[in-house]
Amino acid sequence: MKHLTEMVRQHKAGKTNGIYAVCSAHPLVLEAAIRYASANQTPLLIEATSNQVDQFGGYTGMTPADFRGFVCQLADSLNFPQDALILGGDHLGPNRWQNLPAAQAMANADDLIKSYVAAGFKKIHLDCSMSCQDDPIPLTDDIVAERAARLAKVAEETCREHFGEADLEYVIGTEVPVPGGAHETLSELAVTTPDAARATLEAHRHAFEKQGLNAIWPRIIALVVQPGVEFDHTNVIDYQPAKASALSQMVENYETLIFEAHSTDYQTPQSLRQLVIDHFAILKVGPALTFALREALFSLAAIEEELVPAKACSGLRQVQEDVMLDRPEYWQSHYHGDGNARRLARGYSYSDRVRYYWPDSQIDDAFAHLVRNLADSPIPLPLISQYLPLQYVKVRSGELQPTPRELIINHIQDILAQYHTACEGQ
């Protein structure tokens, strides 16, 4: 099941191929991704982050075993073969416990790694770049690498214990700024320098040797770097190949390594393709998929208001706004400005903090109410044309059923299609 190692081998042989990683726990996003991969007969890489899923439940309330069960059950229900499903863990390390002393945070990180590997996650991103309570800021490359090597050893031992062999594939390094989109308004972004990338690699190689892990180096398939792509609330910093050319050329000297690019959300299709050509061959996407989900839901809510008497409407938009105001912890430190600016950001920001609220029971009830209201009778074509024009074209051509669920799924798949095309290769 070495889909990733094989992808890297083909890329190194000149195929200019890649793979995208779906970073979301939302059932509709995952259904869209599984159905899209099934239709195109490709493997599917789904990743959970250390914030979403951990041994204590993360913000989704799921452990790694829970998440795997949830994804596999969904895949089975859609007849997607589990051997084409790759599960990854993203930013695994002391990320969740930076407020604790390093010894305690790393003990938790050991258990985090054990829980992911024991649950059958095969792509493991080791990220120990963050300073803990009693650490200097920033950490040296050597400390980061030593901690990553410690976690790699835990991962290897856990994998052998549970599966009889160590077949994990690793990603090392981190991007700047923090995961999940920038907090501040951006205008310019520093690209990782070749020297910094080399220093990260050599520090990790040395640390792995000290742990007796030389043999796993060929399974370290990717280094996370910053190719110069990012987004904030209303802007996207587009990939500029010229600025990343030295970095791109540097990785050509490493036989089994490519780059992994985070925060590729909202890049143009041309930029996504160029990133893969330039060896940033693992493209992470998350907020752009839940952003598309949100677009489709807001569009359907607008259609509902045209069709259904006000007192019978789901009120999805207002419920979402009320819940976000009642529980501001997921957006308050991200969205700034006056009341109107924050209101707009809650609904429309590229950073899509609303994604943390879809599982809320009130919002979920409003969503179910919306779908029921629109499923009772066919949605008039002119309203689909008005609010979901790309889906309207497919409905008219007969390739898409105009049901609420299918319209949502297809709108998300429009984003997945851009990533699929970027990763196909020659």
UniProtKB/Swiss-Prot annotation:
Family annotation (InterPro entries): Aldolase_TIM, GatZ/KbaZ-like, GatZ_KbaZ_carbometab, TagBP_ald_KbaZ
Biological processes annotated in GO: carbohydrate metabolic process; D-tagatose 6-phosphate catabolic process; phosphoenolpyruvate-dependent sugar phosphotransferase system
Superkingdom per UniProt: Bacteria
A Gene Ontology term for the protein's cellular component: plasma membrane
Pathway membership, UniProt: Carbohydrate metabolism; D-tagatose 6-phosphate degradation; D-glyceraldehyde 3-phosphate and glycerone phosphate from D-tagatose 6-phosphate: step 2/2
Transmembrane segments: none
Pfam families per the UniProt record, alphabetical: GatZ_KbaZ-like
Family: Belongs to the GatZ/KbaZ family. KbaZ subfamily.
PANTHER family membership: D-TAGATOSE-1,6-BISPHOSPHATE ALDOLASE SUBUNIT KBAZ, N-ACETYLGALACTOSAMINE PERMEASE II COMPONENT-RELATED
Role, per record: Component of the tagatose-1,6-bisphosphate aldolase KbaYZ that is required for full activity and stability of the Y subunit. Could have a chaperone-like function for the proper and stable folding of KbaY. When expressed alone, KbaZ does not show any aldolase activity.
Known partners and oligomeric status: Forms a complex with KbaY.
Entry protein name: D-tagatose-1,6-bisphosphate aldolase subunit KbaZ
Organism: Escherichia coli (strain 55989 / EAEC)
Lineage, broadest ranks: Bacteria, Pseudomonadati, Pseudomonadota, Gammaproteobacteria, Enterobacterales
